[in-house]
Structure formats: structure tokens, C-alpha cells
Amino acid sequence: MTINPVSRKVAWLRVVTLAIAAFIFNTTEFVPVGLLSDIAESFHMQTAQVGIMLTIYAWVVAVMSLPFMLLTSQIERRKLLICLFVLFIASHVLSFLAWNFTVLVISRIGIAFTHAIFWSITASLAIRLAPAGKRAQALSLIATGTALAMVLGLPIGRVVGQYFGWRTTFFAIGMGALITLICLIKLLPKLPSEHSGSLKSLPLLFRRPALMSLYLLTAVVVTAHYTAYSYIEPFVQNVAGLSANFATVLLLILGGAGIIGSLVFGKLGNQHASLLVSIAISLLVVCLLLLLPAADSEAHLALLSIFWGIAIMVIGLGMQVKVLALAPDATDVAMALFSGIFNIGIGAGALAGNQVSLHWSMSTIGYIGAVPACAALVWAVLIFRKWPVTLEEQPR
């Protein structure tokens, strides 16, 4: 299909709008990682106790992704996105007003509900809205929104929290979401539900061993990453003995490296997703094993964070491409399952980091995370050799 320059420009503008929405959603998902110490101090709790909020959020997303996707499968996507943002904004206002930790957790559950639906439909929408032959690049742009949430949203949210209080951070995210909602209303066309699948799709997907193997890989590698990443801010301050300001800089470096990873994947991901993901998991293993040794200096931690950020971004993108390639006939169901399983990994990793920090030593979170990372590497090599497939091999 030939797309004239104007149509191509409009198509990219719509994908950019989704990328902005991804930035907003990922900023609020990631920002508690940089605010754990401040929230703990506010409620007179231990940092590890507050960290359970990360697990609750992730597991709510995991449990609700598929049910919510099925309940909304026939709703026009533009209208659905608008409704999601209304709940998203209201939940952030409640976060701002939270008078105790329980209320804060309730507000985060509301945000998690919107998250569960948003990430089950966004990748497939980006592919629908992208110019012909640019599906991997469209996914890369969405991932850039994710990376910018890490490189800008998370550090800025942390700085705002340091100087104006963590409540202000959540309020600012809510106001940013309001502006984004206005942009969505003005720019997005009507998007009827397509290839969303139904409960009938589940047995079909479950009979695809390549897809099931990929879901298992996702859960294991994400668990590995979040075991250490969830507690990187207190690790930098309490284990490495470095300043709170350097913790902010480190998060900035890690997120910036994620942008590099998304650019690399956008260039090579169409045909080499399997190789890129395998290399990235290898990098993740090395980074986790070297986390404690690197804590002896700011320079070593900064260098490690560059490779870590590149690795996790390539892993996330590669997994999405593989899922979409293996389930082109039920993309929303497949992505809902992917989002749920991804968040099982986040919750499991955050819980592992929580338990290690409470009952053992926070200094070992890298070593603990490296165990599932090594298992993920072996599994990745096995399944990618057995089931090689690329996104562009599938019919549009």
C-alpha cells in the first residue's frame, strides 16, 4: 500500500501521541522507585516496607490485564483511551491527597487498573497507526516514550519529590496526563477494535509452544531485572554510601541508555530480534553480577548503568516483537497476557528484593537477580534456535 507524504506524516503524528501516553504511564510506574525513601520517611516506615507497593501494583496489573482486556474488547479504542486517562488522573489526585499509606496503595491500584488495559492495546494500536513497513520503528517509538520516562520522568519526579515532596510529584503527573488527554481527543481518529480476540483465543494461544515459551522467558528475565532495579535508589545510598543526588544521576544515566537501546532495536529489530535479545540478556547477567563490585565508585556504577539500560530496553522491545509475530490473529489478547506476565515478573522481582533487603542484605540484590537472569539466558538461546520468527514475516 502506497502512503503519500501527508498521510505518512499524520500516521507518525498519531504514533507520537501514543508514545507521549506511554511516557505518562511509564513515568508513574517507574517514579516510586526513586521516591521510596521519601515516602517511607513521610509515613514513618522502613524503605523495604514501602517497597511492597511496587509488588502490589505489578500484581494487580498482572491479574487484571486479561479480564479487563476481554471486558473492553468491543469498545472503540479512542473512547477507551479517554476513559482510561480520566481514571488515571483521578487516581493521581488521590495519591496527592493520601493521608496514610493504605490510601496511597488504593490510589496506586486505581492507576494499575488503567495500566492493565493501556499496555494490552498500545503495541497493537501503534502497529495499526504506523506507516507501511514501519511496525518495528513504531514499537521503538513507543519504547522511546518508555525510555524517556526513565531518563526524564523518573529523575525529574525524584527531584520534585526531594524539593517539593513526593505528593507534588504525583500531582504533576496527573496534570501532565490531563494535557495528554486533550491531545488524544484532538489527534487520534476513531479506532474500532480489531483482532482483539476473545476467550476463544486463549486455547489457541495456549497451544502455541513458542508463545508459551516466550511468556516464561519474559517472567524470568523481568524478575531478574526488578530484583535489583526496584531497590537501586536505597542501594546507591545505603550500600554504596553515595549521595541522594548521585542516585538521581544514576537513574538518569540508566534511562538515557535505554534510549540508545531503543534506537539500536529500531534499526536492527525487524530481522535480528532473537540475536539482540540474547545479547541483551547476557549483558543483564554481567551487570547484575557486577553491581556490588561496581559500588566502590561513582564511575563504575555509571558505566554499568549504561549497559544495563541498553540491555533491558532491547529485551523489552524484543519480547513485544516476538509476541506480536507469534499471535497476529489475536494481538490484544496476546499483549494482555504479555503485560500480565511482565508484571508478574516485576512483582516477583520487587518482592525478592524486598525480602532480601529485610531478611538478608540489600548488598546482595545483584547476585540474587543474576540467578534467574542466567536461567533466562539459557532458555532464550534454546527457544530462539527452535522458533526463529520476525515481525515483518507476518502479514500486515
Swiss-Prot record:
<keyword id="KW-0472">Membrane</keyword>
<dbReference type="InterPro" id="IPR020846">
    <property type="entry name" value="MFS_dom"/>
</dbReference>
<feature type="transmembrane region" description="Helical">
    <location>
        <begin position="15"/>
        <end position="35"/>
    </location>
</feature>
<dbReference type="InterPro" id="IPR011701">
    <property type="entry name" value="MFS"/>
</dbReference>
<protein>
    <recommendedName>
        <fullName>Probable sugar efflux transporter</fullName>
    </recommendedName>
</protein>
<feature type="transmembrane region" description="Helical">
    <location>
        <begin position="209"/>
        <end position="229"/>
    </location>
</feature>
<feature type="transmembrane region" description="Helical">
    <location>
        <begin position="136"/>
        <end position="156"/>
    </location>
</feature>
<feature type="transmembrane region" description="Helical">
    <location>
        <begin position="103"/>
        <end position="123"/>
    </location>
</feature>
<comment type="function">
    <text>Involved in the efflux of sugars. The physiological role may be the reduction of the intracellular concentration of toxic sugars or sugar metabolites.</text>
</comment>
<dbReference type="Pfam" id="PF07690">
    <property type="entry name" value="MFS_1"/>
</dbReference>
<feature type="transmembrane region" description="Helical">
    <location>
        <begin position="169"/>
        <end position="189"/>
    </location>
</feature>
<dbReference type="InterPro" id="IPR050189">
    <property type="entry name" value="MFS_Efflux_Transporters"/>
</dbReference>
<keyword id="KW-0813">Transport</keyword>
<feature type="transmembrane region" description="Helical">
    <location>
        <begin position="275"/>
        <end position="295"/>
    </location>
</feature>
<keyword id="KW-1133">Transmembrane helix</keyword>
<dbReference type="InterPro" id="IPR023495">
    <property type="entry name" value="Sugar_effux_transptr_put"/>
</dbReference>
<dbReference type="GO" id="GO:0005886">
    <property type="term" value="C:plasma membrane"/>
</dbReference>
<dbReference type="InterPro" id="IPR036259">
    <property type="entry name" value="MFS_trans_sf"/>
</dbReference>
<dbReference type="GO" id="GO:0015144">
    <property type="term" value="F:carbohydrate transmembrane transporter activity"/>
</dbReference>
<feature type="transmembrane region" description="Helical">
    <location>
        <begin position="364"/>
        <end position="384"/>
    </location>
</feature>
<keyword id="KW-0997">Cell inner membrane</keyword>
<feature type="transmembrane region" description="Helical">
    <location>
        <begin position="246"/>
        <end position="266"/>
    </location>
</feature>
<feature type="transmembrane region" description="Helical">
    <location>
        <begin position="301"/>
        <end position="321"/>
    </location>
</feature>
<keyword id="KW-0762">Sugar transport</keyword>
<keyword id="KW-0812">Transmembrane</keyword>
<feature type="transmembrane region" description="Helical">
    <location>
        <begin position="81"/>
        <end position="101"/>
    </location>
</feature>
<comment type="similarity">
    <text>Belongs to the major facilitator superfamily. SotB (TC 2.A.1.2) family.</text>
</comment>
<keyword id="KW-1003">Cell membrane</keyword>
<feature type="transmembrane region" description="Helical">
    <location>
        <begin position="50"/>
        <end position="70"/>
    </location>
</feature>
<feature type="transmembrane region" description="Helical">
    <location>
        <begin position="333"/>
        <end position="353"/>
    </location>
</feature>
